[in-house]
Amino acid sequence: MTAQLIFALTLLLTLGVFAFTMRRIFINFRYTKKKALHNIPARLRETFKVAIAQEKIFRHPVMGLLHALVFWGFIVILFGSIEMVIDGLFGTERVFGFMGWFYNFLMASGDIFAAIIALAILVFLFRRLFLHVKRFYGPEMKPVSKADANLALSFILFLMLSLLGMNTFYLLEMHNEGHAFVGVYPVSQSLADLFAGMNDGSIIFWHNFNWWFHILLIFVFANVLPYSKHFHVFMSVPNVFVSRIEPLGKVDNMDNITKEVKLMLDPSAPMDSGAEEPIEKFGVSDANDVNWVNYMNALSCTECGRCTAVCPANITGKLLSPRKIMMDVRARMKEKSDGLIREGANFDDGKSLIGDYISEEELWACTMCNACAQECPININQPSLILDMRRYLVLEQSKAPSGLNTAFANIENNGAPWQFSPEDRMNWAEELYLNEK
């Protein structure tokens, strides 16, 4: 009974801290711009294909397979974690054992996946510590980012080792007490043979130790994740669901500008009621100007660097790093959060996303090729955010590279981006030989 009370208090503390942290993060969504979601069936298909089946991660076949196995393994092992919580609260042992063959299948799968995940994590740590993969580095990747990744991987490694240890000593304890064990544990059964000579007291101690170590590690890890780049453990699946399902090259129009153009072409054209509402600002200049999907993208970013690794601007030495864009949005929102909560959307601390975090040079280096969005394993759309920041610079600040300003002037004066009079547009054909009929 004492153990159950301690467990219940620990669980309550864990849930309380987690709820407080998540509230601090998700309250920021109220300060972002609205964005409607359509075509739910297509979103569900995209979620299954990209998030569950891990389709895009397999563009790097070997490491992609290891990552997918870790993801699928966590889904299977989650069943056992839920069982542990129930056992801890009610003092039971393997409470879901009544499920029979299905329980045996899940336990066997979880046992095998625990070993696979442990090996995969060792490979990931080796790559990070010794192989120096280029995309793991960059000006935006501070030492804390590298330490964060190593810490999270270490958490996962110890979670898997403690799970295997718990199963191993559970089998030994049941065998020594003459009880039939519940479930099937192929890997742990093999490990149990290595400890068969231990005395009963040691076996019971190590079973209890691994059980408590594993569940407490889960509780701690759950509360560390929201402060880590590995927050994508929670955010990646919902992020894929809300991600863009239209073609990546499609540019969303700005409703207010579309309205003005329609009125210029046809003053009697009917307007949507929503288009009549005035807006405070064109584009994005600060973190709370982004729409809620952009903010979810920023929270979900794993900092894996796959986007930056394929960015033609970054490859050719430009300042732009799509990964940095998402990291900056997240960091700026975190910095501004307290003020927004205290004073509302009008809070101004004298800083902004553009200028203090992201330079104009970075924004104009983007070619809008969408390579980053196509490569991102969780469908983050960096170009849409870059485009909105460019819109702010042009429409609100009248700032654009000289080449664009020339094109704008030509469009205004000549109806085309080129510096020729409309009357001269067919001059190129004067010397062509045309057969007359």
Question: Model regions: which residues?
Answer:
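Membrane-embedded alpha-helical bundles of multi-pass integral membrane proteins
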Residues: 1-270
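Short, glycine/acidic-rich beta->alpha junctions
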Residues: 3, 7, 107, 293, ...
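Peripheral terminal and linker regions in Fe-S/redox and tRNA-modifying enzymes
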Residues: 5-6, 21-22, 61-68, 75, ...
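Short acidic (Asp/Glu) and glycine-rich catalytic loops that position anionic groups and cofactors
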Residues: 24-28, 215-217, 304-309, 366-370, ...
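Aromatic-capped, Gly/Pro-kinked transmembrane alpha-helices
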Residues: 56-66, 83, 286-298, 303, ...
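Short, well-ordered loop/turn elements at secondary-structure boundaries
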Residues: 65-72, 147-148, 155, 297, ...
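Ferredoxin-type iron-sulfur electron-transfer modules in oxidoreductases and energy-metabolism complexes
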Residues: 270-298, 308, 314-420
